């Protein structure tokens, strides 16, 4: 695997020098300063590429080119936003950058309720608490019909939890959910959030799939033409939330994408932390079935709790994700490609790490502190080395 590291650009609290010392050779980044939907010019792409290469690294993967909400709702100026996206792909290819991670999650990107969940060893992790989320949705956001998405027990627990929250607890929970986490391109006030949710009131799973198909049928031929590999990131968490449909959550969703546009440019990001939240997702089987189309991996781990819809970011090698079998399947896919004469390694980043050690005393981006990701990268690197030596060094 190609070892990579997500970097949020010149304002990132983790420097490119830090990235190189961590042992990564590739950088995963995006032009976050360009408004959603606008074309990334060749000039701006080359500026960022030069910064990365001057640090002795390569720009391996774009994560992400945001998809304008008009495209997802099939309203407004969606045709122009699609044309802009096509041009950005052409410009990236012209600059030699050919792997693009993206997602099709409506309104929100990845979602957590607690950004400072304290683990038994004193380090901090990200957490999604189903009951806190229900309390937010029913008692703070007050979304009409929200109760239909929860069990009677969850509704009662959410009311009890809300009753114990201070004003600061409520404000913090609201910020965590709607203010935008690292990598998210949108943050909202409560009123703005309600208005954005309203745009989806008539969009169910079938309609969102229809809108996604329009996007794929416009984008994938361009990607194929210029040699760019599109790698869709799964929903996080991988299930409907806030009354919003989710359409990249299961192996059936992956198959639907392939059936909709059967091009090798139409591929996947294997995010084990996102897919792994669902107990019915067999990660190794997913890799084996869709291995030739996996162009990027996020190797992180999650642990489901007593309520199976509650989870936290766990240690990379101690979670519901069998990291050994996952890495083995990825390495096997790389060797399959090599046997076909392809030399491309699959870029991997350790994704979210725990806030730990000296980083506990620093300001950090939630999930993206340096030391926790350094630990995760080193652990995954060790697993891969052991697998390579044991099975492929003959």
Swiss-Prot record:
The keyword Lipid metabolism does not apply. Gene3D superfamilies: Divalent-metal-dependent TIM barrel enzymes. Its cofactor is Fe(2+); Mn(2+). It catalyses: D-mannonate = 2-dehydro-3-deoxy-D-gluconate + H2O. Its EC number is 4.2.1.8. GO terms for molecular function: ferrous iron binding; manganese ion binding; mannonate dehydratase activity. Pathway: Carbohydrate metabolism; pentose and glucuronate interconversion. Belongs to the mannonate dehydratase family. This is Mannonate dehydratase.
């Amino acid at each position: 695997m190609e070892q990579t590291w997500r970097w949020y650009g010149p304002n990132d609290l983790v420097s490119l020098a830090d990235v190189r010392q961590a042992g990564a050779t590739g950088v995963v980044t995006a032009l976050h300063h360009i408004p959603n939907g606008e074309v990334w010019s060749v000039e701006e792409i080359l500026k960022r590429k030069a910064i990365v290469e001057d640090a002795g690294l390569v720009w391996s993967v774009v994560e992400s080119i945001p998809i304008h909400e008009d495209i997802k709702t099939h309203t407004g100026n969606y045709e122009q936003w699609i044309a802009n996206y096509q041009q950005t792909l052409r410009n990236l290819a012209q600059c030699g950058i050919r792997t693009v991670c993206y997602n099709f999650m409506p309104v929100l990107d990845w979602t957590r309720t607690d950004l400072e969940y304290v683990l038994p060893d004193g380090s901090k992790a990200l957490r999604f608490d189903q009951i806190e989320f229900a309390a937010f949705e029913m008692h703070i956001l007050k979304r009409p019909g929200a109760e239909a998405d929860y069990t009677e027990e969850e509704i009662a627990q959410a009311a009890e939890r809300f009753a114990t929250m201070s004003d600061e607890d409520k404000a913090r929970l609201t910020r965590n959910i709607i203010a935008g986490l690292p990598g998210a391109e949108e943050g909202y006030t409560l009123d703005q959030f309600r208005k954005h949710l309203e745009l989806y009131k008539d969009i169910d799973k079938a309609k969102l799939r229809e809108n996604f198909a329009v996007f794929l049928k416009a984008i994938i031929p361009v990607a194929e033409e210029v040699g760019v590999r599109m790698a869709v990131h799964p929903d996080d968490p991988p299930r409907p939330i806030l009354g919003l449909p989710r359409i990249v959550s299961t192996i059936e969703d992956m198959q639907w994408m392939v059936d909709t546009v059967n091009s090798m440019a139409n591929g996947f990001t294997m995010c084990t932390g996102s897919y792994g939240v669902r107990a019915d997702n067999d990660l190794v089987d997913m890799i084996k079935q869709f291995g030739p189309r996996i162009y990027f991996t996020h190797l992180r781990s999650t642990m489901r709790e007593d309520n199976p819809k509650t989870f936290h970011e766990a240690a990379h090698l101690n979670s519901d994700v069998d990291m050994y079998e996952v890495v083995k399947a990825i390495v096997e896919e790389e060797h399959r490609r090599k046997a076909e004469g392809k030399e491309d390694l699959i870029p991997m980043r350790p994704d979210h790490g725990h806030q730990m050690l000296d980083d506990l005393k620093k300001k950090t981006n939630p999930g993206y502190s340096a030391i926790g990701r350094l630990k995760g990268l080193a652990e995954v690197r060790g697993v891969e080395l052991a697998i390579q030596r044991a099975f492929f060094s003959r």
